[in-house]
Swiss-Prot record:
Catalyzed reactions per annotation: Mg-protoporphyrin IX 13-monomethyl ester + 3 NADPH + 3 O2 + 2 H(+) = 3,8-divinyl protochlorophyllide a + 3 NADP(+) + 5 H2O
One function term, GO molecular function aspect: iron ion binding
Xref: Pfam families: Rubrerythrin (PF02915)
Organism: Prochlorococcus marinus (strain SARG / CCMP1375 / SS120)
Gene: acsF
Origin organism lineage: Bacteria, Bacillati, Cyanobacteriota, Cyanophyceae, Synechococcales
Function of the protein: Catalyzes the formation of the isocyclic ring in chlorophyll biosynthesis. Mediates the cyclase reaction, which results in the formation of divinylprotochlorophyllide (Pchlide) characteristic of all chlorophylls from magnesium-protoporphyrin IX 13-monomethyl ester (MgPMME).
Keyword Glycoprotein recorded: no
Keyword entries, A-Z: Chlorophyll biosynthesis, Iron, Metal-binding, NADP, Oxidoreductase, Photosynthesis
Tree of life domain: Bacteria
Keyword Nuclease annotated: no
Involved pathway(s): Porphyrin-containing compound metabolism; chlorophyll biosynthesis (light-independent)
Protein name: Magnesium-protoporphyrin IX monomethyl ester [oxidative] cyclase
Length: 347
């Protein structure tokens, strides 16, 4: 598929991926999980909190904030290079949001088929928000002359299976790190309005509110499975997913730093602030989080980034050696000290 600068959006061939979506470890993915196990979630141990969260999601506070008639045409003319950077961000974001929609929708359907109507409707609310976000991103892409065929995209990319505990840990972090990404970009653009190149960014404030609520919903689900956050298992899952999500965020943000620079944001400092805030927020859900006081975890990001770039750019016999250095660094970061939290748990 090719992009166009005018006229109707270009269309994808049957086996084509959207532009700017090369297949690699940092590409957004589609997921599936243990739906039958999820349907056995014991809500009674969290009944009061669940009903309060259900009412909040049902209220759909951001319905009127997402105006489907609002223009998403870019405000500024961009150079071909900056246009490609902006489009790349939109494509990867729309795939990520649509992936969340599909997962939440499937969980909702499985709950309803299992007779768990409350839980089914609960996840319908989450799917509603993700679909709304994907719709706005899709509209923004169409103004750039790109039409991503979202319904057929999962047919071109195999879904990745995760156990339920993995899905809940990763979903919580995905929503909370998304919240901090959106809110920090929103705050920066409000302080620097000259950097707002498209009206899409005007929707980032309600957008981040949705992400924050979704994280709280997933936290509630985790609390209904006490075994996921107890003992050695809880510590290992906390360590693994915090490390994985933070590492992926660092590599993605800094590898695609041109987008943040387009907005006047230093990608390295942005990545650091997002990680600090997400780690702190995770104290409300995870039994353990990384200890940042000594600065080792954050400072190692720079060494890891440099090793990653060297490996990617290296050729010949030196490439395996560069990969070995990169792997040793990330494993060293993985084993850094953690601290116990006071996260509320049921059971």
């Amino acid at each position: 598929m090719t992009t166009t600068t005018s006229g109707a959006p270009a269309s994808l061939g049957r086996n084509e991926l959207p532009p700017h979506l090369d297949e690699n470890l940092l590409t957004p993915r589609f997921y599936t999980t243990e739906f039958e196990k999820a349907a056995k979630t014991d809500l009674e141990i969290a009944r009061k909190d669940f009903e309060a969260m259900f009412k909040e999601m049902e209220a759909d506070y951001n319905l009127k904030h997402f105006d489907r008639k609002a223009s998403l045409e870019r405000l500024d003319e961009l150079s071909p290079e900056d246009k490609a950077v902006y489009e790349s961000y939109l494509v990867r974001s729309v795939v990520s949001e649509f992936s969340g929609f599909l997962l939440f929708k499937e969980i909702s359907n499985r709950f309803k088929k299992a007779g768990r109507q409350e839980l089914g409707q609960f996840f319908t609310f989450l799917a509603r928000d993700e679909a709304r976000h994907a719709g706005f991103l899709g509209r923004a892409l169409k103004t750039e002359g790109i039409n991503v065929d979202l319904p057929n995209l999962p047919k071109k990319r195999a879904a990745t299976f995760f156990p339920l505990s993995w899905v809940l840990y990763s979903l919580y972090l995905s929503e909370k790190i998304g919240y901090w990404r959106y809110i920090l970009i929103n705050r920066h653009l409000k302080a620097n309005p000259d950097k707002v190149c498209a009206p899409l960014f005007d929707f980032f404030e309600p957008w981040c509110q949705d992400e924050n609520r979704h994280g709280d919903c997933i936290n509630l689900m985790m609390r209904c499975w006490p075994g996921m956050t107890k003992g050695f298992r809880g510590k290992l899952l906390s360590r693994f997913f915090l490390w994985t999500v933070f590492l992926t965020h660092t590599l993605t943000v800094c590898e695609r730093g041109e987008f943040y620079e387009l907005l006047g944001i230093d990608p390295v400092l942005f990545d650091e602030e997002v990680i600090i805030q997400t780690n702190n927020t995770s104290k409300n859900a995870f039994p353990w989080v990384y200890k940042f006081e000594d600065g080792k975890f954050l400072s190692m990001r720079i060494d890891i980034l440099n090793a990653f770039k060297k490996w990617r750019n290296q050729n010949g016999i030196k490439k395996p050696l560069a990969l070995g250095k990169f792997v040793l660094l990330i494993l060293k970061q993985f084993t850094l000290p953690m601290e116990k939290t006071d996260a509320v748990r049921y059971g």
